[in-house]
Amino acid sequence: MKFIANLGFAVRSYLAGLGLGARLFIRLIGLFGSNMRRFGLVRDQVHFLGNYSLAIIAVSGLFVGFVLSLQGYYTLQRYGSSEALGLLVALSLVRELGPVVSALLFAGRAGTSLTAEIGLMKAGEQLSAMDMMAVDPVRRILGPRFWGGIIALPLLSAVFSAVGILGGWMVGVLMIGVDAGSFWSQMQGGVDVWKDVGNGVVKSIVFGVTVTFVALLQGYEAQPTPEGVSRATTKTVVVASLAVLGLDFILTAMMFSI
């Protein structure tokens, strides 16, 4: 009997959290016009979140490009296709690794920062104080951060892919000795702007919505204690990372089936 009661309590808590999340998401989407009219707040968040993650995104992209070029060259060399190295590096980064790895790094860096910021504001009763002063905290605090994250992640993903391609060129052309003309011409001829780059942009936007919303929701729902905020930041990384990987599979399957 106790097991059934605990199970019912867990299901009820899960459904209540799901309902709160759905209401908050709908509210944030509905604030698009209001937040865009006060774009300065959104711009500040894009600047903050972008600067917060730019260094780790750029360095990670460079080393991913190094590894892709090394692995790709020795694999293609077996089949006499080493001139296609540029195409392999570009497609791998633009289609998959750029959006996915950028989103995972964004979740660990900027996502935890958002969760901790909102959680500490809740613990310090700043959100409650704003309510008492007739200032909507969702509109004033959460909304600009939500749209700022959605704008920042595609830009960071583009930086990751560009730096990764540069890293692939450095290893493939300067270190290994692949012909530079073949490297760039294969890339230029084989990468489709709408199908490949467009799909990568769509993925990065979806991941931006997912990671930013998870981070804000966890901070908004965090228990107003130091331990509660700590658990919320940890949960942000876990939930956002799993959501990104799951959505990547779904989006890839949909895009290749069209």
Give the ranges of each region predicted by the language model.
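Hydrophobic alpha-helical transmembrane segments of multi-pass membrane transport/permease proteins
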Residues: 56-71, 250
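Start (N-cap) of specific transmembrane helices in multi-pass transporter permeases
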Residues: 136-157, 232, 236
